[in-house]
Design a protein with these regions (language model features):
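Small-residue (G/A/S/T)-rich helix-start motifs and N-terminal tracts that mark the onset
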Residues: 1-122, 129-146, 151-169
């Protein structure tokens, strides 16, 4: 429909309808498995905080890419309920992804994966930067990708798009 809004602000009632309260039949798989591709040796706090925040939402399981020994040790020391994996994200069984926070050039492959993942994904920081280039190359993020940039990341994102196609703006 041409008049269907592309953006909508949710109110309290919308959230009540969308969020399921766990009951006695709930378990980790019914509550959702979230894959996390966050953090780096330079920014380990991004991994620790994002995983802790995810765990605090009530998600059933968090699977964290812990291919770096140091980051994996930190993660399990702070968040022992986290399940770490070391292989490619494509081999993991998750319901959704979150990533990009605290990532750097060494995790470029993870951010690329988020852009193409068949599962829904929340893209932050480094993944937002990569998303602009991805879009300008003619690719689509699809309807299940959410960008969560802070003001500086949003400015870089929009600047890249504007520089590539100024006539669109």
């Amino acid at each position: 429909d041409a008049h269907k809004p592309a953006l909508r602000v949710l109110d309290r009632e919308d959230y009540r309808e969308l969020i399921e309260i766990p009951d006695e039949h709930s378990h980790k798989y019914t509550r959702g498995v979230l894959g996390m591709l966050t953090g780096s040796l330079e920014y380990p706090g991004a991994a620790l905080m994002s995983v802790r925040a995810a765990l605090n939402t009530g998600v059933g399981m968090v699977r964290f890419n812990g291919k770096d020994d140091t980051l994996r040790t930190l993660m399990l020391g702070q968040n022992p309920e986290t399940v770490c994996f070391t292989g490619p994200p494509a081999h993991e069984h998750v319901h959704a992804w979150a990533g990009g926070s605290g990532t750097g050039p060494e995790t470029l492959d993870h951010n690329r994966y988020l852009l193409n993942a068949p599962e829904p994904a929340i893209l932050d920081a480094g993944a937002v930067d990569l998303a602009a280039d991805y879009l300008m190359a003619g690719h689509s993020l699809g309807e299940h990708k959410i960008l969560t940039p802070h003001a500086g990341e949003l400015e870089r994102f929009l600047r890249r798009i504007h520089e590539h196609s100024p006539q669109r703006w």
